[in-house]
Amino acid sequence: MPRLLASATILAARLTYWTDPEETERKLTSTQSQQAPSSHGPLDGVKVLDLSEDIAGSFCGRLLADYGADVLKLEPPTGASLRRMGPFFGDDPHPEKSLFYLLMNLNKKGATLNLETVTGRNILKRLVPHVDVVIESYRPGYLADFGVGYDDLVAENSSLIMTSITPFGQTGPYSQYKGEEVVNYAMGLIMSISGIQGEEPLKHGGFQAQYEGGLNGAASTSIALFMQSNTGEGQHIDISVTECVASTAMATQ
């Protein structure tokens, strides 16, 4: 228990929260914010807005932060869904005690922003010119319906990279479907090589599909940043978690 307490304390200490959206904007666009301490990582100086709600998007942002990017996690006023995911410190299901949430958001700053309000959307548009990357995991078309989709945000910052990580990608017949972990495994064919021959297939332990989506998202974003630094151009990265799983399944055949 002492080790668990120490770990939770360290994780919490690495997260800085701003709850007032106007304060968020002031801090991100101020000269002081632009001159954040150097992390001496390969992505030092890169600024990222993480709008994701799931494991894959959060893990993508976590990896970018680990490599030195300045990542700000923007959550709805009710908090990101990962806050309600255990295990919890002391077995207390409190939104500030989800060890999973803290682990996925290590090395990030945090703020609340309500994208369902005009004020929140306007603040997001004013923040975008000051960042290099936006990560999101909403249903395809959700942000566009509110006027803050890729086409809307790239109008504010022509070199913006948006990384969208969803169960089935931005296009295609399944794009609007929800996809839980076991669905990603089954449709990505990885369950065809799990379990014992002649018996029912088994789901792998943990959230490997989500981690694969986040890992591919971070790798693709890093490549896009290389292009951005050379050409000044941004792009919209479309990551399908199921396709990431399928790629892994192909590699094991």
Feature locations, PLM:
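N-terminal helix-loop segment corresponding to the beta1-alpha1 unit
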Residues: 17-233
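Substrate-binding/catalytic subdomain of NAD(P)-dependent oxidoreductase enzymes
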Residues: 224-253
